[in-house]
Amino acid sequence: MAHKKGGGSTKNGRDSNPKYLGVKAAGGSTVSAGTIILRQRGTVIKPGNNAGIGRDHTIFSLIDGVVTFRNGRNNKKQVDILPC
C-alpha cells in the first residue's frame, strides 16, 4: 500500500487578477478635465454632456465641473459633467 496519496490533478486552484471596475467619482463630486469617472465592461452607463468614453468604455470628464448621474433615453443611465 502506498504511504502517500497520489498528486492528483485539480481543475481549481487559480484566481484572476482584480480589474478595479466601478465608479471612481461619485455624483456631486468636483472633477477636473480628464478625470476618470467610472470603469466598466460594456456601456452599462453612457456618457452624457461634457463626458467622453474611452476604448475600454471608461467614462471620463471633458471639462472641470460636477458629476451628475441621470436616466437618459429609454431609461438608460447617463453621466453628465456640469460646469462649475
UniProtKB/Swiss-Prot annotation:
PROSITE patterns: RIBOSOMAL_L27 (PS00831). Keywords: Ribonucleoprotein, Ribosomal protein. InterPro entries: Ribosomal_bL27, Ribosomal_bL27_CS. The keyword Ribonucleoprotein applies. Gene3D superfamilies: 2.40.50.100. Residues 1-21 are annotated as: Disordered. GO terms for biological process: translation. One of its GO terms (cellular component) is cytosolic large ribosomal subunit. One of its GO terms (molecular function) is structural constituent of ribosome. Pfam families: Ribosomal_L27. Belongs to the bacterial ribosomal protein bL27 family. This is Large ribosomal subunit protein bL27. The gene is rpmA.
